[in-house]
Amino acid sequence: MGMTSDSIADLLTRIRNALMAEHLYVDVEHSKMREAIVKILKHKGFVAHYLVKEENRKRAMRVFLQYSDDRKPVIHQLKRVSKPSRRVYVSAAKIPYVFGNMGISVLSTSQGVMEGSLARSKNIGGELLCLVW
């Protein structure tokens, strides 16, 4: 698995494709940033769980996907906002409310990667990585 120039977009695409194919899990290359994003998705119930595994001195992450009782993905959309070619930064006041608060935004802040509502409550902005609903 080669790292693309945008590993976050790659992570979101892999999750999106795995959900469309109704897979139970998806394997992705591990990075601290990717794990931080997946950890938030797990905390908010968008993924079931994940584990980090070591293979041939390379770290991989297995993300177990979450489906509703009628086997529909609980994630409707994963949208990359900030991109390497066009970074998007927001102040705390400009952190979006996603899909009538059913969704989340994920930010990279001076205090680490966190969910938008947490950044808003701490009154800190940052790079708007992605939206999930």
UniProtKB/Swiss-Prot annotation:
Part of the 30S ribosomal subunit. Contacts proteins S5 and S12. The keyword Ion transport does not apply. Keywords: Ribonucleoprotein, Ribosomal protein, RNA-binding, rRNA-binding. It comes from Chlamydia pneumoniae (Chlamydophila pneumoniae). It comes from the Bacteria. One of its GO terms (molecular function) is rRNA binding. This is Small ribosomal subunit protein uS8. Belongs to the universal ribosomal protein uS8 family. GO terms for biological process: translation. InterPro entries: Ribosomal_uS8, Ribosomal_uS8_CS, Ribosomal_uS8_sf. Pfam families: Ribosomal_S8. One of its GO terms (cellular component) is ribonucleoprotein complex. PANTHER family: 40S RIBOSOMAL PROTEIN S15A. One of the primary rRNA binding proteins, it binds directly to 16S rRNA central domain where it helps coordinate assembly of the platform of the 30S subunit. The gene is rpsH.
